[in-house]
Amino acid sequence: MDQGPINRPHFFFTTAPMPCPYLEGHLERKMVTDLTGPEAERLHESLSRAGFRRSHTIAYAPVCPGCTACVPVRIRARAFVKNKSFRRIVRANAGVTAEYVPARATVEQFHLFSQYQQARHGESDMALMGFFDYRSMVEDSPISTSIAEFREAGGELVAACLIDHLSDGLSAVYSFFNTTLPQSRGLGTWMILWMVDETVRRDLDHVYLGYWIAESSKMAYKERFQPLEVFGRRGWIAFDERGRPG
């Protein structure tokens, strides 16, 4: 993929303060920009490497006053080695098959998405999403995006992940799974492990996981996937070096 310079001026905006969905009592603000036009793919590549994330047709990054809790993280896929716990999860899902499908919303996906939201995020706005909202989340992408569907041997859809394709790896946009299955299946963890393996199969380097938040149980789990890199003033550095002055 051509990684040349962006050829036209690009405008960034900040959102109004809103209650933070991860840290109680905090307010969040985001810097956002539209991913439109012929340079959308190239702009998304550059911004992803600068810690931005994509939602629909915008790229965003947190710029919350007085707070730096959201830390962009990515897994070094080639150096990743599954520990005992991860290997157990892989064995528990040995019968699950994965298939890339185009980023097109289906009723089957939406039913699974809704069940997941009600079980895990029942108080959030996402739990109120209808099919057309879900379709917008999946299909409104100006870049190379697909869905990985994961099915049991009998064909039942048990998990799915919306994935952006980058020249250096894969970016997990949003994943969901059947929460009624035994917790020992660890389907959320298993999807990340699958993405690591898929990244290596594609001869790429990184799995972008979005933001790690140490104080949030919903986001702190990402530190389990070592070796991990974090993005900050010094660019991408090893997770273990994040507290060192640079």
UniProtKB/Swiss-Prot annotation:
Name of this chain's protein: Aspartate/glutamate leucyltransferase
Keyword hit for Transferase: yes
ATP-binding listed as a keyword: no
InterPro entries (alphabetical): Acyl_CoA_acyltransferase, Asp_Glu_LeuTrfase, N-end_Aminoacyl_Trfase, N-end_Aminoacyl_Trfase_C, N-end_Aminoacyl_Trfase_N
Catalytic reaction list: N-terminal L-glutamyl-[protein] + L-leucyl-tRNA(Leu) = N-terminal L-leucyl-L-glutamyl-[protein] + tRNA(Leu) + H(+); N-terminal L-aspartyl-[protein] + L-leucyl-tRNA(Leu) = N-terminal L-leucyl-L-aspartyl-[protein] + tRNA(Leu) + H(+)
Pfam families associated with the record: ATE_C, ATE_N
Family: Belongs to the R-transferase family. Bpt subfamily.
Function: Functions in the N-end rule pathway of protein degradation where it conjugates Leu from its aminoacyl-tRNA to the N-termini of proteins containing an N-terminal aspartate or glutamate.
HAMAP family: Bpt
GO function terms (MF aspect): arginyl-tRNA--protein transferase activity; leucyl-tRNA--protein transferase activity
Biological process, per Gene Ontology: ubiquitin-dependent protein catabolic process via the N-end rule pathway
Known EC number: 2.3.2.29
Subcellular location: Cytoplasm
Native organism taxonomy: Bacteria, Pseudomonadati, Pseudomonadota, Alphaproteobacteria, Rhodospirillales
Record key words, sorted: Acyltransferase, Cytoplasm, Transferase
GO cellular component terms attached to this protein's record: cytoplasm
